[in-house]
Regions:
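Conserved acyl-donor/pantetheine-binding loop and adjacent beta-alpha core of acyl/acetyltransferases
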Residues: 99-136
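Conserved acetyl-CoA-binding loop-helix of GNAT-fold acetyltransferases
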Residues: 136-139, 145-160
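Conserved N-terminal entry element of GNAT/NAT acetyltransferase domains
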Residues: 1-39, 43-55
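Conserved GNAT-fold acetyl-CoA-binding loop/helix
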Residues: 49-73
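Conserved beta-hairpin
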Residues: 82-98
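Conserved GNAT acetyl-CoA-binding A-motif
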Residues: 131-134, 144, 160-178
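Conserved active-site alpha-helix within GNAT-family acetyltransferase domains
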Residues: 150, 162, 175-195
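A short helix-loop-beta-strand connector motif used in the catalytic cores of GNAT acetyltransferases and
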Residues: 72-87, 103-108, 133
Length: 215
């Protein structure tokens, strides 16, 4: 893991985009997503959800340009359904988004999820009694590594604590294409490895690492 993170840091340094303005914390506002945000949310997803996956920049597993109507409809549904769907914006321009599900919402979509995980032998299963699962965190491809994801997480954590939920889960793809950027973010956010999940996606087996964080 340390070698992976060191390589990631080197890649990010060499690939830094110098011409972009620095985003100061005071300029970025995080709020709940609304139906009027869907087009920009879709654009952000397209910027990191492509056919070709970039391990060091980070990616979403889906190819969003393949079916715009389908994915926009999914985002619209999520705006109405989810308690924790947030966007980060500056001057009415969305910079990133975060989608998270309560346990009830997640298991309604993935009823066998808990049983499908190969849990770490020392993981305390009581932590699955009540949780929120972060399904997607996406930042515009040209604005990564600028603290936007951390701001989205701070809003999420405040809200889940207010609901007296203290367990967060998230999954990171490691095969067939490893998401090194996501692995680095898990470490930054103090997640610990909880298990491994194998799932079939587009006819292939995808391997995800399942991470847990107490908040």
């Amino acid at each position: 893991m340390e070698e992976i993170l060191a390589t990631l840091k080197e890649q990010q340094t060499t690939r830094k985009i110098h011409h972009l303005p620095v985003i100061h914390h005071g300029q970025v506002f995080v709020r709940r997503a609304s139906i009027g945000d869907v087009d920009q949310i879709y654009d952000i997803a397209c910027s990191v959800g492509k056919t070709r996956k970039d391990s060091y920049q980070g990616f979403l597993i889906d190819d969003y340009k393949a079916d715009p109507e389908y994915y926009k409809a999914k985002f619209k549904g999520a705006v109405f359904e989810l308690n924790h769907f947030y966007v980060a914006e500056r001057s009415d321009v969305l910079l990133g988004f975060l989608m998270a599900y309560t346990k009830k919402q997640w298991l309604a979509k993935n009823p066998g999820w808990i049983e499908e995980i190969h849990w770490h032998p020392e993981f305390d299963m009581k932590k699955t009694e009540n949780f929120v699962l972060v399904d997607k965190t996406a930042i515009r491809a040209d604005l990564t590594s600028r603290g936007i994801g951390s701001r989205l997480y701070r809003k999420l954590i405040r809200d889940v604590r207010a609901r007296e939920v203290h367990n967060l889960f998230g999954e990171t793809v490691v095969d067939p294409v490893p998401n090194f950027a996501s692995l680095a973010f898990r470490k930054k956010q103090n997640y610990t490895l909880a298990g491994v999940h194998y799932e079939r996606y587009n006819g292939k087996i995808v391997t995800d690492l399942v991470y847990h964080r107490f908040v």
